[in-house]
Amino acid sequence: MQLRISSLVKTVSAAAALAFISMAQPALAADAEVSLVIKDHLFTPNPLEIPADTKVKVTLENRDQTTAEFMSDDFKGGKLVTGGKTVSFFIGPLKAGTYEFHDEYKESISKARLIVK
C-alpha cells in the first residue's frame, strides 16, 4: 500500500509540473514580431509601429561596427547589441501612444519613435 501511494504522489507531482510548464510556455511567445535596423546610428524604420496591448518580439540588427544600445526612458526598455550582430528582445504590452527610443551611446542623433496603435 505504501508503494502505491508513493507512486501515485510521484505521478500527480509530475502531472502538476507538466501542467505548470505548459502554462508558462505561451508567456515566452510573442504575439507579434517586428524588425529594426540601426545603421549610421539611425534606426529604421522610424517610426516603428506595433500593436497596442501586445507582447512584441523585436529583432534588432546592428549594421554599424560599434556597439549600440536600444534604450527607452518612456517604456523602460533596453538592449545592447555589438557591431555587426543581431539580437532579439521583447517589449510590451504597451498602451496606445507614441514613445521615444534611442541608441544610448549616440542619443542626440539616434532618437526615434515607437507608435503603438
Enumerate the language-model features and the residues they cover.
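Bacterial N-terminal signal peptides that target proteins for export
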Residues: 2-13
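Bacterial N-terminal signal peptides
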Residues: 11-22
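Sec/Tat signal peptide C-region and signal peptidase I cleavage site
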Residues: 23-29
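N-terminal edge beta-strand
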Residues: 30-53
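Extracellular/periplasmic metallocenter environments
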Residues: 35, 82-117
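Beta-strand-rich interaction surfaces with strong enrichment in secreted/lumenal proteins
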Residues: 46-48, 76-80, 90
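Short beta-strand/loop motifs in extracellular/secreted proteins, especially
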Residues: 56, 66-68, 110-112
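Asparagine-centered strand-capping/turn motif at beta-strand->loop junctions
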Residues: 60-62
